[in-house]
Amino acid sequence: AEGDGSVDTP
């Protein structure tokens, strides 16, 4: 996700 601080993207 975007901007959620997950492992996917920052």
UniProtKB/Swiss-Prot annotation:
- Indicate the temperature dependence noted in the record: Optimum temperature is between 45-55 degrees Celsius with hemoglobin as substrate. Loses 50% of its activity at 65 degrees Celsius.
**The entry's keywords:** Aspartyl protease, Hydrolase, Protease
Query: Is the keyword Protease in the record?
Result: yes
Q: How does activity depend on pH?
A: Optimum pH is 6 with hemoglobin as substrate. Activity decreases from pH 7, with a 36% decrease in activity when incubated at pH 10.
GO molecular function terms here? aspartic-type endopeptidase activity
Q: Which domain of life is it from?
A: Eukaryota
Q: How is it used?
A: This enzyme is capable of clotting milk and thus can be used for cheese production.
One Gene Ontology biological process: proteolysis
| Catalytic activity, reaction form | Hydrolysis of proteins, favoring hydrophobic residues at P1 and P1'. Clots milk. Does not accept Lys at P1, and hence does not activate trypsinogen
- The EC number of this protein is 3.4.23.23
The record's comment on protein family reads: Belongs to the peptidase A1 family.
Which protein is depicted? Mucorpepsin
